Amino acid sequence: MIISQTPLRISFVGGGTDLKDYWSVKPGAVLSTTIDKYVYVIIKERFDDYIYINYTQKEIVNKLSNLKHDLVREAMLKTGIERGVEITTLADIPSEGSGLGSSSSITVGLLNALYAFQGRQVTAEQLAQEACEIEIDILGNPIGKQDQYIAAYGGLREITFNPDETVTVESVKIQNAYKRSFGSNMLLFYTDVTRKSSDILVEQKANTRDKMDILTQMKDQVHLLREILESDDCCDEAGQILYDAWQCKKKLSEKISSPAIDKMYQQACDAGALGGKISGAGGGGFLLVYVPREKQNAVRAAMKDYRDFPFMLDPDGSKIIFNMRRAYWK
């Protein structure tokens, strides 16, 4: 039996510049972190030749091509496993529409577990690259590359997407004391709305060339935020950058926010939040807000109608947490 654990992520700034329509023209960049909420992939060898898949549905098929779960199907094809396995996926949060990158975390976790099932160790770069190939090139999802890379590498990272299709991943060298402060000053509230990111990203992708100036401004915010995080001064300027980033992001598509989300955001700011953003593509999922410690009780009281979702920053990417492997055969 193999179990992989792959973290979910929070994207702070730069989202949208990881779409090919942007980075094929000029380099894109994001600043993201992984958090202590995960997706798990469990792979168990079966005596028979059937394929058993357990998620929100249960599938039992005798041919890989008959699998409806496209991420599992393509990950198995990519890794060369065709039969005789049972695969179960579990998640700490709603598996679709959370805005925390769960689909890409599942893809990365599947690849990691399937390779481990064969006794193979692969790099974070390979996991990220192959997850992008599956989700973007093969399945044609209108998404960017940031989720796959942050899930594979983990930690607090600046990720740059270059026109030559290379990707550069750098650690943000934040002091430990500030890292604790930065992490503890962020609150996450569930909007109680889930949505398919593709519904928003299709429109955003179509508008990319018309929104290049806004996207470039969002990319510049990556460097501003990194500069603040790596400075010696622990300050709350990060909240203002998140506020500015959210104002930019809303200009990319009318679907990114809604009257309900705007009201929720304003409630948090009125109670003391310095800034924030809806996670992922927008439209629902989770609202991230930056709140100084002394204002957090007031913000939680103002947001009492929404579920508070405590989290911590996680320095690790996808990893194998259990490996009891018998001899594998095809």
Model features per residue range: what roles?
Residues 82-88, 120-127:
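Short secondary-structure capping/junction motifs at helix and strand boundaries
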Residues 100-124, 155:
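DPxDG-like acidic metal-binding loop motif
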